[in-house]
Design a protein with these regions (language model features):
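N-terminal capping/lid subdomain adjacent to the active-site entrance of alpha/beta enzymes
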Residues: 1-22
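Generic detector of well-ordered alpha-helical packing
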Residues: 2, 6, 36, 76, ...
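Alpha/beta enzyme core
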Residues: 15-36, 66-67, 71, 79-92, ...
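Alpha-helix-loop-beta-strand connector modules within alpha/beta enzyme cores
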Residues: 2, 46-76, 83, 110-117, ...
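Glycine-rich, proline-tolerant flexible connector loops at the mouths of alpha/beta enzymes
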Residues: 7, 32-59
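Conserved anion-binding
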Residues: 4-10, 40-44, 97-152
Length: 152
C-alpha cells in the first residue's frame, strides 16, 4: 500500500502535525511508503518553484523521519528538491515526468544511490501507435538513460 500526502494549497492548509497524524494512521492501516509532494502533478495544476516546494516538504520530511521508520518518497520532478530531500534521508524519488523535465534529476538520484519511481508522462496525449507500445518504449528509454547515469 502506498500513502500519498500532497500539499496542493497556496498556503499551508495541511500542517506538519496533521501530516504526521495522517501518516501514522496510514502506516497503522498498512502503508509501506509515505509519498509526499509540495506541488500537485494533476493536469492543469499551478506551477510551484523549487524553493516553494522545498518550503512545503522539508518540515514534513524532518518530522516524519523523527517519528516513523517507514520509507519516504518525495513526488517531484525537480532535481533541487530531490537533492535536498535525499540529503534528509528520503529513500525514493517519485518523478511523474520520468526524468524528462530536469536534466539533472538522474544524476542527483544516482549521486545519492536512491530508489526512483519513473512514471510515463507526456505533454501530448496523441500517440503515433498503440498506447501500450508507446509506454513500453518510453520506459525502456528511461531505464537505459537511468542505467547510464548510475554507471558513470
Amino acid at each position: 500500500m502506498l500513502l500519498l500526502i500532497v500539499f496542493l494549497m497556496e498556503v499551508n492548509l495541511i500542517s506538519v502535525d496533521k501530516a504526521l497524524k495522517h501518516a501514522i494512521k496510514m502506516v497503522e492501516e498498512g502503508a509501506d511508503i509515505i509519498d509526499l509532494g509540495g506541488e500537485s502533478t494533476r493536469p492543469g495544476h499551478s506551477y510551484v518553484d523549487a524553493d516553494e516546494e522545498l518550503r512545503r516538504v522539508i518540515p514534513v520530511i524532518k518530522k516524519l523521519k523523527e517519528e516513523l521508520d517507514t520509507p519516504i518518497s518525495v513526488d517531484t520532478y525537480k532535481a533541487k528538491v530531490a537533492d535536498e530531500s535525499l540529503k534528509l534521508g528520503v529513500e525514493m524519488i517519485n518523478d511523474v515526468w520520468g526524468l524528462t523535465k530536469d536534466k539533472d534529476m538522474a544524476s542527483v538520484i544516482a549521486k545519492h544511490n536512491a530508489y526512483v519511481c519513473i512514471m510515463h508522462n507526456q505533454d501530448d496525449t496523441e500517440y503515433d501507435k498503440d498506447i501500450m507500445e508507446s509506454i513500453k518504449e518510453f520506459l525502456t528509454r528511461k531505464y537505459k538513460y537511468s542505467y547510464k547515469s548510475w554507471n558513470r
